[in-house]
Amino acid sequence: MTATALTATDLCCRRGDRWLFSGLSLNLARGEALHVLGPNGLGKSSLMRMLAGLLPPSPDPVSGITGAIAWDGPLALMDERHGLDLGQPLGAALAFWARVDGPVPDEAINGLGLANLLDVPVRYLSTGQKKRAALARLIGQNAPNWLLDEPLNGLDVAACAMVERMIARHCAGGGACIIASHQPLGIPALTRLDLAEYAL
């Protein structure tokens, strides 16, 4: 029997006077990748922040019951905030986080095309290069559960393929991953969750 990475039940999200989604439940097993999709404004980023524990679920608009989220093991979140010191060379910026989270494996540095950028100040990196560096930092956290919010934004076709390979490798090794993206994903055995089905 495959171990469960995440169980979430009856998640609802209200921002101000607007309900984004309601009644969302999901289970994620080890080795699985889930693609959360839907147009902008439906609450993809809000769901990711909720799953990361940064945003509390809203009480159900009918029952008043607040949903629950249970992870098996640590999780790591990657969103638009890369957290890298703009004034430092990339290698030094990653080394800072390595002292906090753990070192980034050379395999990840090479697989994400960062080996030739380690001496370049972060401020001079392109959006796509910073995105790949943020993924390298996430890999260094050695968490079994990944939350990736729009990881392909700003990436060219080759870089998208790099990121997809890293996600596939993580899941093949027993990790679990939830990816919020409006772009198609080329990841084996990917399941999908359309937030439009839970919109109010």
Residue ranges and their predicted role:
Residues 52:
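Helix-to-loop junction immediately C-terminal to a conserved catalytic motif
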Residues 135, 174:
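Hydrophobic anchor residue at the start of the ABC signature
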